[in-house]
A protein has these predicted regions:
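N-terminal Lys/Arg-rich, disordered targeting/topogenic segments
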Residues: 1-9
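Extended, charged catalytic domains and RNA/DNA-binding interfaces, predominantly
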Residues: 10-192
Length: 192
């Protein structure tokens, strides 16, 4: 009798396991748990040369107006940019959080170029949420963003490759917090 009860428990466990695995298979196959949106599309146009020239002229005139000496240029940038590859940005972008939806890498490049007029920026999605696929897409997107921006002495924006590394410790001595890792190079063979 005891053996029979034990066999019934094992049988129930097997049926439950097979049912759970089947449900998981269908959930993954039909995208019920979400789908990978990919890196998005970067607009294949840089800021028109007239606009860049106008910005430079405005800066030069402003420099003269206040009597500043020298020709140094102030650059504006953002070295902490997240896309929805980062969990916190993903949650904040959900419509139920009053967000506007997915914000992929292509949107980050376009926003830096056309909306915020950044001279430079760095992608810094959370390293903990990265996968080999996402990292590869990140590298390709940053390379594309810079290719559109133009090479040489006057690109419309410069995109840097990087990630945000987070370490939380239980004491001040072991807590390092958030650190942005930013690479000088974007060539595939020069980055991890």
């Amino acid at each position: 009798m005891l053996k029979k009860k034990r066999l019934i428990k094992i049988l129930y466990g097997l049926v439950a396991s097979v049912t759970a695995l089947t449900a998981l298979f269908f959930a993954l196959a039909y995208g019920w748990l979400g789908i990978h949106d990919g890196p998005g599309v970067i607009t294949e146009a840089r800021i028109p040369e007239e606009i860049i020239s106008k910005r430079e002229l405005t800066q030069s005139n402003s420099r003269k107006k206040i009597g500043a000496k020298g020709a140094k240029q102030i650059l504006f940038g953002d070295l902490h940019v997240h896309t929805t590859y980062s969990f916190d940005a993903f949650i904040g972008s959900l419509p139920m959080m009053h967000g506007e939806g997915s914000r992929p890498l292509g949107d980050a490049c376009d926003f830096a170029r056309f909306c915020s007029a950044l001279d430079f920026w760095s992608i810094n999605d959370h390293a903990e949420a990265s996968t080999p696929r996402r990292w590869s897409e990140t590298i390709e997107s940053i390379q594309q963003c810079n290719a559109v921006g133009g090479h040489g002495n006057n690109p419309d924006t410069v995109a840097f490759l990087g990630w945000e590394w987070t370490q939380e410790g239980g004491t001040p001595d072991t807590h390092y917090g958030h650190k942005n890792v930013i690479f000088r190079d974007i060539e595939t063979e020069k980055v991890p």
